[in-house]
């Protein structure tokens, strides 16, 4: 049987342990609320607005302007891309704080600069266009001047060739048309030669059909010179007609040639026989007696 003293000792130890545990547990609960109170009482971090509210007025105003400028820049960057392309770029040093008013001034300054540059570019482009137009005008004037000089040179050469040809023809006519009197030849001047040549042409037109040998004798010419003269007049267009194989020249006027051409055009296809049969009506071969007398008397 256990002694009472031992039981009392065990009970005392058990009670002491219980009291220790109870005190320990209560102390932990009181410390936790105290810690919570300390944490709740500790100052929390302030926001930008709270810091700005507690800052001096000047610093607070500068910060507000900077924030407004940032918001404006952010809104501009989020705007339409087309408006961004037309907005001039503003060079702001890195780290530099710019307010809204300052930013507006910088934008206006940049816009004026861009406008000046655009106007300057427009002036340069206009100068280039005017320069090109002036060069083109000068080139056209130079080409026109060269063309006029070329035409003038061609006209001058044509006149010289015509004068030389007329002089040569005059020499040939002067050699062909001579008047033999008392064993010597009288050389005609230019006017007399031209008059005699006109009489020569008028006589052929009046007679219509002339024997070249008789024509040469009538105008005191060699037959070969007379034939050559008729051919030259035909080439010059002063006589129209044909020379047959018997040495006759048949004069055909321009009106008669047009009548023959009209006849052929109306008939479409014309045989030689039809043309010969109709030639008496289209071409008049009867001499003009009055004209012949007038030429011979001149």
Curated annotation (Swiss-Prot):
It is a single-pass membrane protein. The keyword Acetylation does not apply. Coiled coil: none annotated. GO terms for cellular component: endoplasmic reticulum; endoplasmic reticulum membrane. A motif (UFM1-interacting motif (UFIM)) lies at residues 176-190. It comes from the Eukaryota. Residues 1-4 are lumenal. Keywords: Endoplasmic reticulum, Membrane, Transmembrane, Transmembrane helix, Ubl conjugation pathway. InterPro entries: DDRGK_dom-contain (IPR019153), DDRGK_domain-containing (IPR050899), WH-like_DNA-bd_sf (IPR036388), WH_DNA-bd_sf (IPR036390). Residues 26-298 are cytoplasmic. Residues 105-140, 147-166 have a biased composition (Basic and acidic residues). It holds the Pfam family DDRGK. GO terms for molecular function: ubiquitin-like protein ligase binding. Component of the UFM1 ribosome E3 ligase (UREL) complex, a multiprotein complex that catalyzes ufmylation of endoplasmic reticulum-docked proteins. The UREL complex plays a key role in ribosome recycling by mediating mono-ufmylation of the RPL26/uL24 subunit of the 60S ribosome following ribosome dissociation: ufmylation weakens the junction between post-termination 60S subunits and SEC61 translocons, promoting release and recycling of the large ribosomal subunit from the endoplasmic reticulum membrane. Component of the UFM1 ribosome E3 ligase (UREL) complex, composed of ufl1, ddrgk1 and cdk5rap3. The UFM1-interacting motif (UFIM) specifically recognizes and binds ufmylated RPL26/uL24, resulting in stable association between the 60S ribosome and the UREL complex. This is DDRGK domain-containing protein 1. The lineage of its organism: Eukaryota, Metazoa, Chordata, Cephalochordata, Leptocardii.
